[in-house]
């Protein structure tokens, strides 16, 4: 959603902070909020003026006409305010059809004034600009301001100056107040623009001799501008409309939505309701709600929501478990229904999202059975067969009744089944597997089809009979612009269209190339890509079986210069970059069409794009769209889904039906419906779900009217806006003569007691004429073919098509099979069609899922269990969860081996490298490369040597004598500095810990007996730290209970123990590197006097 209402308190706080005007605004920041939890003593301490002034009190919960409802207390003392609040605060009230609790009130100073000092001011956004309304008689009885007020349109990118205000708005205002009003309205408009408001109303605005008072205020801001206005807005709150509570679950889903690139929405309508929905797609979610309400389920509909934009399995799981948790809290005598619906996805992996839902169903299978929940599923899109399979499987394994349907079933048919209006088929038709389409594309003969390169009736000149006409039922203000109806160029795309793709969207580009290939285009439609975050290079793609290279440019200018044949740009930039990149694109005259995919571009910026596009003669599709498709010619990005859907919906060749919709998912559903009921799609465009799409329904309908190959037009309209009325006008005035089938979704909105913002930003009616019901009625009366519901849309399309065929306007042609396109390896593997031995294997770590996993343990569990470094090392090195004492011992080993001064070879090398100006990694590596048999490598050797002696059964004295006889050193014995008289405290600390905590220490005991023998000969032949760690580690591996004897011996043999020294000493080496850098030590050169130069005598003579 884009425009969101804010509370009066928030609106005034922002206005008082940021408005710039010469008018003296009084009572700045004088307001106090009261809730049922308010501490009055604290309130009086924070707002002492409450005791000294007369007061006004009113609810601040987005309630209109509070004065007429008796919800404003005027000219009261503080005690009077308390008395007035007593029967109201926390109590239930009914406002229109909505019933809710009054729990948020605003107290302000009372302003004595006369009726003549009250004025009305309102600013609101439209496509063309911002309207400023002013009426010289404000207050409770202002009446119909649209009819009475002075109105001034400030066009996009234009400024409002005080002289225009005086001339056009303050015509009837008192002369002595014109100056102050003009200054205030000018400042108010600048404030409105700067903080991205979409609606701002002050009634009354009171102007007295003391200055300006803002008594009542209502406002909406563009929530998508948060990234621009965050500093000024702060943490702004968006309260729910009166009559609907704010639930923590809604806030949780909103938080998930904010953290995700996908779209996740949830609105609770009736938590005790019987019918729950979990629908994929903004448009589809509205259609399902419509159908439920049409079939009499409005009072039982529990929620509205949608998920779209390819959420991950984990995100879908979180969304699903929230809904399942809500619906299993209260029982219903008739059981409950969960509708998991959706249109045909364009790029969302249905199997991945369904696996998240399946996880949630498994987690809640007990409560679901207890509450007698029946689930109905219908979905299509990439890998949907696998998604439906796992959904059906979970029904069998859990015993929950789950009815599963695919694209062979009409999208909303499951609603009728769920509510008992139509039978549930025992065995629905089985859709072909994804791979079947690709391996045998010509197998389906369900629809007669033409060649791939021409429409059925491209060459026919017969004009279609005009649609039947009737008197239009349009409100006078429904068509704001009186300009004549004119279309832009009728052809946006052809078989030779070339495009540049902005963004590293390799999957979308490959999809476009596969579409081009299956349409038998001569060349790929993507000429180049632009991506500012890399240097110029080439990206590899497939053209059928052949690999090709597509250039990627860092700068758009280079791409345009080297590809002058390009006239389309597909913009995949993020919502933060989409505006700037689109503005830059329009500087190049070669570009005639731009598709903006991003959702969430602020409306004010979109209007600037529209204005510049009109000046440049550029057609914009979007924002917030999947794009469009012209079968046999060109497709934008992910439109039409993957190849299986392209082939199933016959999108590889043109038909005779053109459509335009707002929703990307619903456009794919139209592809499916049209392919099943007619000869197929000629062209289809999804203009996007924002309130101000770059191109409108009428722009494309007029193109279709002027395109000979299009014989009938389908429009899927939507609640919000008045664009559909232009179609009515076009039909009645004879500008549109081809048959038009139209249905506006969102009819359910009129049945809800409180306002619901649907999935698309523009799907909200701001006046009666913007409702879907009003628009459908007007279209019907204008002579457009309007079904009774979306359920009947396919039947109406088929009826109109068959009539055109019967009259010879359309002549179906023979199908020509498309070429076979190979399947990508990655997708074939995803579908389970192929297998290949992996080049690498790993068993310690998995980063592919929602969270990192160490040897089977999620990272969250690692921290929850406080496993520490020792525990993590146990997981990654040994794939075992070690006992607590073992983890502690490992950490102690790392501590005692961390460093042993700068004189040892490894530290010395590190210091030399650091002083030579080398980087951290180079310096560390030079130190590590000295580790071997002479330095630090004794851990493994000592462990092996002592283990072999102990396991062979020879006594310590025999072992010492044997090593002496063989002339070998005993590894782990001896120290240059430490001796039995000067013990190494590191050894002592570890030895005491091991003896105290280890269950058994036979090898350590053996080594200590050896030490007694060696020190008796020479005091420095002690068991050193390497030797102690080596033998103690063997004891730990053998006796901690986590390893078999074979596993313990294997870890010793493969050199695991030397890893302890390497890991520990790395900390010290890094310390030495940082120390030298911090001390700013220069290049080291060894002094001559410390080098003995020994040269051959004959060379020195």
UniProtKB/Swiss-Prot annotation:
<protein>
    <recommendedName>
        <fullName>ATP-citrate synthase</fullName>
        <ecNumber>2.3.3.8</ecNumber>
    </recommendedName>
</protein>
<dbReference type="GO" id="GO:0046872">
    <property type="term" value="F:metal ion binding"/>
</dbReference>
<feature type="modified residue" description="Phosphoserine">
    <location>
        <position position="481"/>
    </location>
</feature>
<feature type="binding site">
    <location>
        <position position="346"/>
    </location>
    <ligand>
        <name>citrate</name>
    </ligand>
</feature>
<feature type="binding site">
    <location>
        <position position="66"/>
    </location>
    <ligand>
        <name>ATP</name>
    </ligand>
</feature>
<comment type="function">
    <text>Catalyzes the cleavage of citrate into oxaloacetate and acetyl-CoA, the latter serving as common substrate in multiple biochemical reactions in protein, carbohydrate and lipid metabolism.</text>
</comment>
<dbReference type="Pfam" id="PF00549">
    <property type="entry name" value="Ligase_CoA"/>
</dbReference>
<feature type="modified residue" description="Phosphoserine; by PKA or BCKDK">
    <location>
        <position position="455"/>
    </location>
</feature>
<dbReference type="InterPro" id="IPR017440">
    <property type="entry name" value="Cit_synth/succinyl-CoA_lig_AS"/>
</dbReference>
<dbReference type="Pfam" id="PF16114">
    <property type="entry name" value="Citrate_bind"/>
</dbReference>
<feature type="modified residue" description="N6-acetyllysine">
    <location>
        <position position="978"/>
    </location>
</feature>
<feature type="modified residue" description="N6-acetyllysine; alternate">
    <location>
        <position position="554"/>
    </location>
</feature>
<feature type="binding site">
    <location>
        <position position="67"/>
    </location>
    <ligand>
        <name>ATP</name>
    </ligand>
</feature>
<feature type="modified residue" description="N6-acetyllysine">
    <location>
        <position position="968"/>
    </location>
</feature>
<feature type="modified residue" description="Phosphoserine">
    <location>
        <position position="451"/>
    </location>
</feature>
<feature type="binding site">
    <location>
        <position position="118"/>
    </location>
    <ligand>
        <name>ATP</name>
    </ligand>
</feature>
<keyword id="KW-0547">Nucleotide-binding</keyword>
<feature type="cross-link" description="Glycyl lysine isopeptide (Lys-Gly) (interchain with G-Cter in ubiquitin); alternate">
    <location>
        <position position="554"/>
    </location>
</feature>
<dbReference type="InterPro" id="IPR016142">
    <property type="entry name" value="Citrate_synth-like_lrg_a-sub"/>
</dbReference>
<keyword id="KW-0963">Cytoplasm</keyword>
<feature type="binding site">
    <location>
        <position position="111"/>
    </location>
    <ligand>
        <name>ATP</name>
    </ligand>
</feature>
<feature type="modified residue" description="Phosphothreonine">
    <location>
        <position position="639"/>
    </location>
</feature>
<dbReference type="InterPro" id="IPR017866">
    <property type="entry name" value="Succ-CoA_synthase_bsu_CS"/>
</dbReference>
<dbReference type="Pfam" id="PF24948">
    <property type="entry name" value="Citrate_synth_N"/>
</dbReference>
<feature type="domain" description="ATP-grasp">
    <location>
        <begin position="4"/>
        <end position="265"/>
    </location>
</feature>
<feature type="modified residue" description="Phosphoserine">
    <location>
        <position position="263"/>
    </location>
</feature>
<dbReference type="Pfam" id="PF00285">
    <property type="entry name" value="Citrate_synt"/>
</dbReference>
<dbReference type="GO" id="GO:0005524">
    <property type="term" value="F:ATP binding"/>
</dbReference>
<dbReference type="InterPro" id="IPR032263">
    <property type="entry name" value="Citrate-bd"/>
</dbReference>
<feature type="binding site">
    <location>
        <position position="109"/>
    </location>
    <ligand>
        <name>ATP</name>
    </ligand>
</feature>
<dbReference type="InterPro" id="IPR002020">
    <property type="entry name" value="Citrate_synthase"/>
</dbReference>
<dbReference type="InterPro" id="IPR056749">
    <property type="entry name" value="Citrate_synth_N"/>
</dbReference>
<comment type="subunit">
    <text>Homotetramer.</text>
</comment>
<dbReference type="GO" id="GO:0003878">
    <property type="term" value="F:ATP citrate synthase activity"/>
</dbReference>
<keyword id="KW-0479">Metal-binding</keyword>
<feature type="binding site">
    <location>
        <position position="379"/>
    </location>
    <ligand>
        <name>citrate</name>
    </ligand>
</feature>
<dbReference type="InterPro" id="IPR016102">
    <property type="entry name" value="Succinyl-CoA_synth-like"/>
</dbReference>
<keyword id="KW-0832">Ubl conjugation</keyword>
<dbReference type="InterPro" id="IPR016143">
    <property type="entry name" value="Citrate_synth-like_sm_a-sub"/>
</dbReference>
<feature type="modified residue" description="N6-acetyllysine">
    <location>
        <position position="1077"/>
    </location>
</feature>
<dbReference type="InterPro" id="IPR036291">
    <property type="entry name" value="NAD(P)-bd_dom_sf"/>
</dbReference>
<dbReference type="GO" id="GO:0006085">
    <property type="term" value="P:acetyl-CoA biosynthetic process"/>
</dbReference>
């Amino acid at each position: 959603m884009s425009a969101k209402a804010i509370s009066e308190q928030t609106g005034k706080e922002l206005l008082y902070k940021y408005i710039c005007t010469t008018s003296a605004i009084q009572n700045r920041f004088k307001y106090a909020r009261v809730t049922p939890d308010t501490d009055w003593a604290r309130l009086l301490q924070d707002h002492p003026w409450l005791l000294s002034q007369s007061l006004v009190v009113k609810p601040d919960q987005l309630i209109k006409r509070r004065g007429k409802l008796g919800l404003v207390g005027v000219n009261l003392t503080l005690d009077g305010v308390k008395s007035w609040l007593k029967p109201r605060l926390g109590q239930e009230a009914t406002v229109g059809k909505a019933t809710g609790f009054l729990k948020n009130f605003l107290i302000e100073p009372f302003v004595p004034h006369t009726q003549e000092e009250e004025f009305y001011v309102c600013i609101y956004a439209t496509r063309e600009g911002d309207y400023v309304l002013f009426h010289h008689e404000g207050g409770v009885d202002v009446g119909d301001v649209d009819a009475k007020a002075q109105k001034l349109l400030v066009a996009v990118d234009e400024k409002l100056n005080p002289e225009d205000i005086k001339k056009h708005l303050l015509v009837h205002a008192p002369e002595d107040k014109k100056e102050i009003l003009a200054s205030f309205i000018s400042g108010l408009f600048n404030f409105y623009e700067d903080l991205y408001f979409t609606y701002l109303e002050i009634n009354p605005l009171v102007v007295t001799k003391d200055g300006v008072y803002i008594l009542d205020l209502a406002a909406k801001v563009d929530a998508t501008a948060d990234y621009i206005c965050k500093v000024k807005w702060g943490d702004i709150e968006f309260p729910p409309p009166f009559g609907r509570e704010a639930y923590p679950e809604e806030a949780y889903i909103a938080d998930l939505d904010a953290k995700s690139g996908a779209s996740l929405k949830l609105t609770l309508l009736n938590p005790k309701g019987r019918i729950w929905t979990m629908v994929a797609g903004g448009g589809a979610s509205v259609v399902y709600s419509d159908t439920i309400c049409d079939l009499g389920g409005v009072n039982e509909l529990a929620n509205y929501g949608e998920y779209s934009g390819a959420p991950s399995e984990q995100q879908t799981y979180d969304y699903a478990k929230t809904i399942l948790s809500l619906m299993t809290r209260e029982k219903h005598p008739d059981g409950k229904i969960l509708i998991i619906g959706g249109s045909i996805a364009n790029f969302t992996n249905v199997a991945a999202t369904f696996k998240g839902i399946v996880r949630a169903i498994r987690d809640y299978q007990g409560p679901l059975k207890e509450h007698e929940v029946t689930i109905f599923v219908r979905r299509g899109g990439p890998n949907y067969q696998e998604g439906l399979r796992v959904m059906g499987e979970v029904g069998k394994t859990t015993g929950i009744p789950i009815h599963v349907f695919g694209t062979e079933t009409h999208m909303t048919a499951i609603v009728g089944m769920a509510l008992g209006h139509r039978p549930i088929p025992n065995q629905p038709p089985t859709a072909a597997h994804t791979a079947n389409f690709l391996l045998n594309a010509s197998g389906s003969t369900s629809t007669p089809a033409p060649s791939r390169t021409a429409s059925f009736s491209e060459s026919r000149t017969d004009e279609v009979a005009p649609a039947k006409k009737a008197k239009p039922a349009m409100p006078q203000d429904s068509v704001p612009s009186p300009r004549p109806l004119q279309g832009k160029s009728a052809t946006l795309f052809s078989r030779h269209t070339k495009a540049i793709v902005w963004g590293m969207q390799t999957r979308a580009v490959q999809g476009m190339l596969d579409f081009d290939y299956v349409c038998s285009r001569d060349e790929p439609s993507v000429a180049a890509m632009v991506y500012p975050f890399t240097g110029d290079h080439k990206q590899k793609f497939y053209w059928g079986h052949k690999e090709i290279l597509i250039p990627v440019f860092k700068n758009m200018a280079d791409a345009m210069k080297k590809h002058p044949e390009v006239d389309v740009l597909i913009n995949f930039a993020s919502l933060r970059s989409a505006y700037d990149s689109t503005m830059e694109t329009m500087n190049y005259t070669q570009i005639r069409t731009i598709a903006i995919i991003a959702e969430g571009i602020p409306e004010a910026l979109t209007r600037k794009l529209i204005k510049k596009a009109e000046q440049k003669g550029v057609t914009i599709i979007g924002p917030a769209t999947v794009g469009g498709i012209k079968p046999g010619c060109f497709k934008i990005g992910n439109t039409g889904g993957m190849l299986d859907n392209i082939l199933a919906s016959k999108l590889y060749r043109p038909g005779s039906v053109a459509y335009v919709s707002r929703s990307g998912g619903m456009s794919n559903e139209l592809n499916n419906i049209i392919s099943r009921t007619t000869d197929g799609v000629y062209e289809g465009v999804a203009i996007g779900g924002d309130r101000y799409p770059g191109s409108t329904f009428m722009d494309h309908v007029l193109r279709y009217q002027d395109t000979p190959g299009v014989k009938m037009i389908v429009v899927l309209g939507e609640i919000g806006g008045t664009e559909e009325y232009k179609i009515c006008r076009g039909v009645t005035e004879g500008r549109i003569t081809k048959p038009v089938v139209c249905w506006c979704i969102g009819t359910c909105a009129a049945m809800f007691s409180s306002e619901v913002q649907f999935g698309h930003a523009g799907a909200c009616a701001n006046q009666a004429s913007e409702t879907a019901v009003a628009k459908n009625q007007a279209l019907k009366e204008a002579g457009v073919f309007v079904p009774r519901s979306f359920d009947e849309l396919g039947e109406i399309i088929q009826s109109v098509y068959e009539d055109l065929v019967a009259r010879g306007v359309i002549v179906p042609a023979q199908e020509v099979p498309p070429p076979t396109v190979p399947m990508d390896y990655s997708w074939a593997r995803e579908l389970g069609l192929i297998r290949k031995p992996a080049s690498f294997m790993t068993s310690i770590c998995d980063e592919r899922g929602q969270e990192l996993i160490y040897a089977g343990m999620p990272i969250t569990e690692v921290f929850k269990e406080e496993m520490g470094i020792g525990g993590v090392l146990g997981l990654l090195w040994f794939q075992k969860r070690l006992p607590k004492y073992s983890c502690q011992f490992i950490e102690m080993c790392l501590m005692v081996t961390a460093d042993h001064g700068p004189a040892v070879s490894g530290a010395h090398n590190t210091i030399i490298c650091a002083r030579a100006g080398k980087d951290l990694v180079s310096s560390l590596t030079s130190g590590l490369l000295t580790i071997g048999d002479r330095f630090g490598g004794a851990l493994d050797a000592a462990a092996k040597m002592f283990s072999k002696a102990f396991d062979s059964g020879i006594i310590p004295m025999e072992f010492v004598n044997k090593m002496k006889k063989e002339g070998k050193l005993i590894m782990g014995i001896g120290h240059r500095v430490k001796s039995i008289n000067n013990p190494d405290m590191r050894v002592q600390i570890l030895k005491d810990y091991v003896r105290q905590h280890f269950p058994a220490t036979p090898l350590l005991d053996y080594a200590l007996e050896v030490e007694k023998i060696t020190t008796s000969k020479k005091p420095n032949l002690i068991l050193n730290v390497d030797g102690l760690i080596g033998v103690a580690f063997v004891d730990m591996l053998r006796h901690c209970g986590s390893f078999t004897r074979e596993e313990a011996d294997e870890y010793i043999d493969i050199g695991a123990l030397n890893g302890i020294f390497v890991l520990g000493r790395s900390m010290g080496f890094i310390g030495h590197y940082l120390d030298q850098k911090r001390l700013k030590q220069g290049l080291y050169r060894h002094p001559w006097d410390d080098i003995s130069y020994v040269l051959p005598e004959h060379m020195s003579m």
